[in-house]
């Protein structure tokens, strides 16, 4: 599918954007004005996407339950019936690795952060709630195995994977909001690479326009499970547009004015 190819291209551009931000941090030996939450949410979101995609590919239990629920769409005797894109798996893995490198810089250059930087309480609460829900659904889904192919409270192992997929999309769709807020609180975008903002916006534009313009004959059950939903890309596009306006127009030339934060 051409749309999947464009998603892969957008992912490749996202990797370039993150590497540009990494280089910017290294050149300035500073992470002043850069959101911790942006790269944390992106890392966790892509990690969950990988977890779900690999289970859809290789978990016989997931494939069996999916086949029992939708036998016409995903027959058990057809190993290729569950649509998963290996290209997108590779993309998510590479993005996760790049985010990890920037997170390492955020720790290494932590002495240069200002008072509003750091992992926010909001992100900690959201990720903690998702972690508890993930552990709870996992425990419910395996409680009756291997005697029964079902879990407590009607939570099958397939539900556990599906819930994590929803959580991953929620984390990914709002990942740029913390950076937008940091820029607003500091009235500056000094810590954000203009190349990162521009290339990221270009990546989301290509992906979004590809879905809107290019016709597709794929039926709903043929769309790869690890393909990012349209509504996630739309929210990312809007928030990136705001950040790009902050970088290019609203806070252009503004100098940093906030004091350094605590280590």
From Swiss-Prot:
Transmembrane helix is among the record's keywords: yes
Topology versus the membrane: Multi-pass membrane protein
Residue ranges of the TM segments: 1-21, 38-58, 82-102, 118-138, 151-171, 196-216, 230-250
Keyword Magnesium: no
GO CC term, one of those recorded: cytosol
Cellular localisation: Membrane
First-listed, main subcellular location of the protein, grouped into a coarse class: membrane
Keywords: Membrane, Transmembrane, Transmembrane helix
Protein's name in the database: Putative uncharacterized protein YCL002C
Lineage, opening ranks: Eukaryota, Fungi, Dikarya, Ascomycota, Saccharomycotina
